[in-house]
Amino acid sequence: MKLLTLIVKPSKTELVKQALHSSGIGGATIIEASGYGSQKGQSETYRGTEYRADTNPKVMFQVACDDGDTSSIIEAVRNAAGTGKIGDGKIFITELTDVVRIRTGETGSKAI
């Protein structure tokens, strides 16, 4: 199993949710986040003064999936979130040793 951590632009949230749903993902954790990287920060001018934010707003999804589904999910997310410009985001792929559904005690793929 894998844990996919997706970092995307807030404007792509609904498209990514639809892509995950179309890929058979029944649930995800979605967190508002901010970060910095190649995109740098944003600057705005207010009453003649420039204000600079060092971070950019992002949305983070966490999704558990079976190993065999990883490639198709990544491709669907890249198609949904990608613009080809700096700041599109990242996908982190982590080995997931186990999952436990609290309500039933199911483990592994059955708990996803």
In which residue ranges do the predicted regions lie?
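Positively charged, small/polar-rich N-terminal and surface patches that mediate targeting and assembly
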Residues: M1-I112
